[in-house]
């Protein structure tokens, strides 16, 4: 990461991310979509355990996309949730998005900032189904002229190599 940002800018970006998390927890998906840049890349890959000797050599095992979504694809996911026909979300999940260790730095692109956060996403469904997703997110956010923000990129890295939940219908 390049140069760190001022405390005020760090605070504004953190508040944007906290607000975004609350929109997801409150199932305000249309409001959440409004926070996304038209060029959003929303990605998650499989996590593969690499041997220490391979990591030292810089060798990473191949991964595959769990999702690699555009804004249009995210809109379709949300439209499906809104139909009541998304059986993975019947009854709807209750989620809590916790983000911490927020690091913000400048990029080479004016008004675009790189953000690294650790996250814990708790999901409860039905009476006994609970899932924890833990990892790191690598986001890029864009500051608009009116000092509002848009999420430009989100790369979600799970710590878990094996996903034990029944599905991945939640948004990170």
UniProtKB/Swiss-Prot annotation:
One of its GO terms (biological process) is 3-phenylpropionate catabolic process. SUPFAM superfamilies: NTF2-like. It holds the Pfam family Ring_hydroxyl_B. Belongs to the bacterial ring-hydroxylating dioxygenase beta subunit family. Pathway: Aromatic compound metabolism; 3-phenylpropanoate degradation. The lineage of its organism: Bacteria, Pseudomonadati, Pseudomonadota, Gammaproteobacteria, Enterobacterales. GO terms for molecular function: 3-phenylpropionate dioxygenase activity. This is 3-phenylpropionate/cinnamic acid dioxygenase subunit beta. Keywords: Aromatic hydrocarbons catabolism, Dioxygenase, NAD, Oxidoreductase. Disulfide bonds: none annotated. This dioxygenase system consists of four proteins: the two subunits of the hydroxylase component (HcaE and HcaF), a ferredoxin (HcaC) and a ferredoxin reductase (HcaD). It catalyses: 3-phenylpropanoate + NADH + O2 + H(+) = 3-(cis-5,6-dihydroxycyclohexa-1,3-dien-1-yl)propanoate + NAD(+); (E)-cinnamate + NADH + O2 + H(+) = (2E)-3-(cis-5,6-dihydroxycyclohexa-1,3-dien-1-yl)prop-2-enoate + NAD(+). Part of the multicomponent 3-phenylpropionate dioxygenase. Converts 3-phenylpropionic acid (PP) and cinnamic acid (CI) into 3-phenylpropionate-dihydrodiol (PP-dihydrodiol) and cinnamic acid-dihydrodiol (CI-dihydrodiol), respectively. Its EC number is 1.14.12.19. The keyword Oxidoreductase applies.
């Amino acid at each position: 990461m390049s140069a760190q940002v001022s405390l005020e800018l760090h605070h504004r970006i953190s508040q944007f991310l906290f607000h975004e998390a609350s929109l997801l927890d409150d199932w305000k998906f249309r409001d959440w979509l409004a926070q996304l840049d038209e060029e959003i890349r929303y990605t998650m890959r499989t996590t593969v355990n690499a041997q220490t000797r391979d990591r030292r050599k810089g060798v990473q095992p191949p991964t595959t996309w769990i999702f690699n979504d555009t804004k249009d694809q995210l809109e379709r996911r949300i439209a499906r949730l809104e139909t009541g026909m998304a059986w993975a979300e019947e009854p709807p999940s209750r989620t809590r998005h916790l983000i911490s260790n927020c690091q913000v730095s400048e990029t080479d692109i004016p008004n675009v900032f790189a953000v690294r956060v650790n996250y814990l996403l708790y999901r409860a469904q039905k009476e006994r189904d609970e899932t924890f997703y833990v990892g790191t997110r690598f986001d890029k956010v864009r500051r608009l002229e009116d000092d509002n923000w848009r999420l430009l990129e989100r790369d979600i890295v799970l710590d878990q190599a094996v996903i034990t939940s029944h599905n991945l219908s939640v948004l990170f």
